[in-house]
Amino acid sequence: MQLKRQDFIASMRSINPADIIVLDESGSDLTQTSDYARAEGGYRAKMPKPHNPGKKFSIIGAISIMCIVAVMYIDCAVNQDIFYTFIKKLLLKHLKPGQYLLMDNINFHKQEQIKKLVESVGAKVVFLPPYSPDLSPIEKMWSKVKEIIKRFQPRTEAEFHNALFKGLADVTAEDLEAWYEECGYEVAA
């Protein structure tokens, strides 16, 4: 596994980070609660958290070093058909010839129809080495967005929608560039 990581890192050094689009899925539900709270001196902060997770959401997103390229959320698990629809309807129009679509190794990412779709616009599919979320800048974005969702404590789909898009709006170009750099992509000064 270590050799695969080293090979991946070496191969990515020859690619301009501006040509790398990173895609990943994340999940959330309606029980998100902030990890931090304030209380008067001598009292413990109480943060009620629903016991029933209620509706669960899957979020699919793609980023570049400059911006969030595409995002979609649904109230079910992502499968091959949903993933294909995301690529075809939302992401494909943003991919350019010579770009690389970087994804993890989940089975439905590896479908031949996904590869053909991406290659139809002149882009290439690249997979992260196994167990390497630390090489994926979008993981850092999901972390920031989920912290913002927690602060809003959504309990309805409308509240979740607002919290998600507030979190996404708070992601800056500086964040994205820093996350690419933290993941080892050589960002020009």
Which functions belong to the PLM regions below?
Residues 97-110, 136:
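Acidic/histidine-rich, metal-coordinating catalytic segments
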Residues 22-24, 61, 87, 104, ...:
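Mobile genetic element proteins and their domesticated derivatives, centered on retroelements
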Residues 17-20, 138-189:
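C-terminal anion-handling pockets and recognition modules
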Residues 26-29, 64-68, 107-109, 132-133, ...:
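Short, solvent-exposed loop/turn segments at secondary-structure junctions
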Residues 22-23, 99-103, 127-129, 180:
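Short beta-strand segments
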Residues 45-52, 121-137:
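RNase H-like polynucleotidyl transferase catalytic core
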Residues 2-88, 184-185:
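Extended, low-complexity cationic-aromatic segments
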Residues 82-100:
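Short, basic/hydrophobic alpha-helical segments
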